[in-house]
Swiss-Prot record:
Keywords: Isoprene biosynthesis, Manganese, Metal-binding, NADP, Oxidoreductase. The keyword Metal-binding applies. NADPH binds at residues 32-35, 150, 152, 229. Belongs to the DXR family. Gene3D superfamilies: 1.10.1740.10, NAD(P)-binding Rossmann-like Domain. One of its GO terms (biological process) is isopentenyl diphosphate biosynthetic process, methylerythritol 4-phosphate pathway involved in terpenoid biosynthetic process. Mn(2+) binds at residues 174, 176, 245. This is 1-deoxy-D-xylulose 5-phosphate reductoisomerase. Catalyzes the NADPH-dependent rearrangement and reduction of 1-deoxy-D-xylulose-5-phosphate (DXP) to 2-C-methyl-D-erythritol 4-phosphate (MEP). Its cofactor is Mg(2+); Mn(2+). It comes from the Bacteria.
Amino acid sequence: MSDSPAPLADPHLVYDPVAGDGPKDVVVLGSTGSIGTQAIDLVLRNPDRFRVTALSANGGRVALLAEQAYRLKARTVAVAREDVVPALREALTAQYGTGEPLPEILAGPEAATQLAASDCHTVLNGITGSIGLAPTLAALEAGRTLALANKESLIVGGPLVKALAKPGQIIPVDSEHAALFQALAAGTRADVRKLVVTASGGPFRGRTRDELAAVTVEDALAHPTWAMGPVITINSATLVNKGLEVIEAHLLYDIPFDRIEVVVHPQSYVHSMVEYTDGSTLAHATPPDMGGPIAVGLGWPERVPDAAPAFDWSKASTWEFFPLDNEAFPSVDLARHVGQLAGTAPAVFNAANEECVEAFRSGALPFLGIMETVTRVVEEHGTPRTGTSLTVADVLEAETWARARARQLAAQTAEARA
């Protein structure tokens, strides 16, 4: 991948090597979520490599946030919800003891963005949703290495991220993109024939579109492989998550959409593959566990020993691969479409999907109604203007419209079903 210009994520480049033998200072955004809690577990097991200086969370789990701050000796904690500050201060006092100095507390919608620009080596953005865009931009602008688990910020603000990021500054934390990142180290970008992104197929692999009509929220939340938050789990059930990952792969590695393939791999052992022009394919494989991708994001270019379990190759196992059923799961094709449209189209796609997932969880939309509504919102948005630079204001305006329109359409569907 030595071609010029370099892609956003390049395993051949190290943006900011650590001087000396001391641990890296890390800020963890979304510390009480799935990625955040696993990252903190990794840090606690490797105090010689990493030191967490600050934590942020939405504010729904203040007891856990306080425990994390105490165990990590974090200097600052931040919550998006200002109303939970008294409860957070009480939880911190319970951890530290009366009379002991507490970490600095930041609160409000900009708190995570403030932390992203604070003094540290690496920012791990583990926030869920497009609200992670501002912290992503802040970390890049401040010159921090960005371990990116918040795929939505790249998807909705691709041109903005690309304008700020320096070569090698972004390390992907998604399991699929961390896998591609490592497999791409074997050659140059000119050597790459295609990227192959694997999908477990979710809980409804093998079902026809008609069979998906009766899917319930409980069904959709029962992912066969990964333990994730409810939004990402439902995105995996619709395969929207895989569509977002296709857009992300295009933006990270500068590979055209027609050279990014999705295949279903139920075992989730192979996380992605790179096919090279000489006919060889390099696959990255581990048992399903986010410890490895998180360790790559925080530790690259070094390997973190025992970050994740390894295979026992003495035991027989079956590894299967199947083509994706685009009729039953149209989300990947729709994601390719909006990715090629570019501009504000990916932001509209993502925002509409977030609203439709909430509508499905509340009972307003049926399972198939998620993608039907998202498709309609994307179609109504039309083709973004070309020849103009995307701004944060453009993204926010498009998201606001898409959310309002998705809610309106979901309400109409709920009324018709009543």
